Amino acid sequence: MDPSLIKVVNQLQEAFSTVGVQNLIDLPQITVVRSQSSGKSSVLENIVGRDFLPRGTGIVTRRPLVLQLINRPSASGKNEETTTDSDGKDQNNSSEWGEFLHLPGQKFFEFEKIREEIVRETEEKTGKNVGISSVPIYLRIYSPHVLTLTLVDLPGLTKVPVGDQPRDIEKQIREMVLKYISKNNAIILAVNAANTDLANSDGLKLAREVDPEGLRTIGVLTKVDLMDKGTDVVDILAGRVIPLRLGYVPVINRGQKDIEGKKSIRIALEAERNFFETHPSYGSKAQYCGTPFLARKLNMILMHHIRNTLPEIKVRINAALAKYQAELHSLGDTPVGDNSSIVLNLITDFCNEYRTVVDGRSEELSATELSGGARIAFVFHEIFSNGIQAIDPFDEVKDSDIRTILYNSSGPSPSLFMGTAAFEVIVKQQIKRLEDPSLKCVSLIYDELVRILNQLLQRPIFKRYPLLKDEFYKVVIGFFRKCMQPTNTLVMDMVAMEGSYINTVHPDFLSGHQAMAIVQSQNSKPIPVDPKTGKALTNNPVPPVETSSSSGQNFFGSFFGSKNKKRLAAMEPPPPVLRASTTLSDREKTDTEVIKLLIMSYFNIVKRTLADMVPKSISLKMIKYSKEHIQHELLEQLYKSQAFDKLLQESEVTVQRRKECEQMVESLLQASEIVSNV
């Protein structure tokens, strides 16, 4: 297996970290999770072979530490051992050093300085209290004594806030850890103390939440030497307690007394090897125990994992690169050239697109909803047409109103025939009712044009120039409102025109004779039939002849009703308000029904006419006019101020986003080049 695969991932991590992004691509990495005081720091230092991690009480690791170990042979070509002084302390040498990504080019040969820099960089982001931050620190260590490996050291899980710790510190750490270990490409290194119940391990519990089958979790058992006499971890190693696909590795760490006494890691690793080789439970499997085996195992697991996921990583890098390149293209380059020409081109493009959207020729036609001109057609043929067809003239005009108008139009002498005056009065009143829905149609079309305007102003170019967008909106809205005035006037004139002349010879109008025939056919009584013989019964009784007194009530009786003879003889003056009575004579019934038929017939003609002509008027005065003159209006208004520099001032969001996209593209191009060589 080629160790350079791990270096590839390290290079990708650095490429993405330079733009401040850690989650752009899900890279293979080993994440370390554990409870506090489980011995995690000692495990990592044993793998490195150096003391370099901050130590103390409470939460010491307060930022993720991406630890990149690079195996680098010594300059002499020999595998130099880490030297110790007379007190057993590790000595620094020129073949081992550390480098921080935030301090490029600066080498730390003294590992105590590395610890100090970790503390300093942590406090720079989190302060000197016990707050935490998810922004990682990148540390690369070169040494001939390490295997090429990358580990992400995460803050230890805690339960109860201590001292100045935030009350929700447990939640903060849990969310941070889950953010790292929930990625499918993350190998979880769960560090657990062997002298505690494994079922209560916080690290394993959290790992099982995101990896319930234990497919990408490897367990590390620390403090094996501190277990009660007669107990061991053989059952755990055999997978009989909590099985993990990648298994467990037992290790021995330095105790607190050893650390305080500056016991070298080289000596501690030798003691670890002797412990496992001489222990009755582990002697036969000593080669699978200890820190050196753990490092080799992690190295092999990570390399296999990288090899398996590398094709997917290449695909994701290329997809992300295409995405950010497209966004960068939509944001456009920094404007170059004459600003007046730029504004002219924007006006031309906007007006052309406005026409295509209204005409339904846009390249971005939706398959899920109506848009543009289709919505205008819906207003014309569904909302407006159905709206005026639903208006019933007899919603407001009752039969009694019709009779009253009939009598009023007759003047002082009762009319022998039904005149046209009453018909025209009622029809004109009802035609006037069609004005409001017609004007409402104009308003709805205005709303649709504004909707199209807002749709066009959502284009990336207008997000780039917010002041120009505001000016476009103001000018076009004012233009639409100017278009509404002559449109409303024309529509009102059309309604008034229909009411100014009642064309009773219209070919579709029902004639008086036809209306009378329809009413008589509806009112004709069927001839009774003998149920036995089936023949018509002709011996009907002759209806009584009306007396002069009863016939005299055909007209006036409906107003005055019946009165006693004494009051009639007194000839009292009529009341201030006269209303028709509810009693109708046969003639009144017939006249009322006939005029209702005539009103409905003519009103339907007018409704059909307006349903056809109002959309045509709006199309002429608003839609067609706006398509032809919107460009002239924009040119006139925008060029009047000559404030092109101000209009083309880019928004801070656009400038910042372009910078971010440029950095992303540069980073992804670098990443693409890295993986293309593998």
UniProtKB/Swiss-Prot annotation:
Q: Where is this region: G1 motif?
A: 34-41
Gene3D superfamilies given in the database record: Dynamin, middle domain (1.20.120.1240), P-loop containing nucleotide triphosphate hydrolases (3.40.50.300)
* Span list, region G3 motif: 153-156
Provide the Dynamin-type G domain boundaries.
Answer: 24-311
**Any one GO MF annotation of this record:** GTPase activity
Residues engaged in binding GTP: 34-41, 153-157, 222-225
PROSITE patterns per UniProt? G_DYNAMIN_1 (PS00410), G_DYNAMIN_2 (PS51718), GED (PS51388)
Segments carrying the region annotation (G5 motif) are 252-255
Membrane spanning stretches: none
**Which GO CC annotations does the UniProt entry carry?**
cytoplasm; Golgi apparatus; membrane; microtubule; peroxisome
Spans annotated as G2 motif = 60-62
Stretches for region Disordered? 71-96
What biological processes does GO assign it?
Answer: endocytosis; intracellular distribution of mitochondria; mitochondrial fission; peroxisome fission; peroxisome organization; vacuole fusion, non-autophagic; vesicle scission
Which Pfam family is one of those matched by this entry?
Answer: Dynamin_M
Q: Where is the composition biased (Basic and acidic residues)?
A: 78-90
- Show the segment(s) annotated as G4 motif: 222-225
GED domain location is 592-678
| Alphabetical UniProt keywords | GTP-binding, Motor protein, Nucleotide-binding
UniProt similarity note: Belongs to the TRAFAC class dynamin-like GTPase superfamily. Dynamin/Fzo/YdjA family.
User: What protein am I looking at?
Assistant: Vacuolar protein sorting-associated protein 1
Q: Which species is this UniProt entry from?
A: Schizosaccharomyces pombe (strain 972 / ATCC 24843) (Fission yeast)
> What phylogenetic lineage does the species belong to?
Eukaryota, Fungi, Dikarya, Ascomycota, Taphrinomycotina
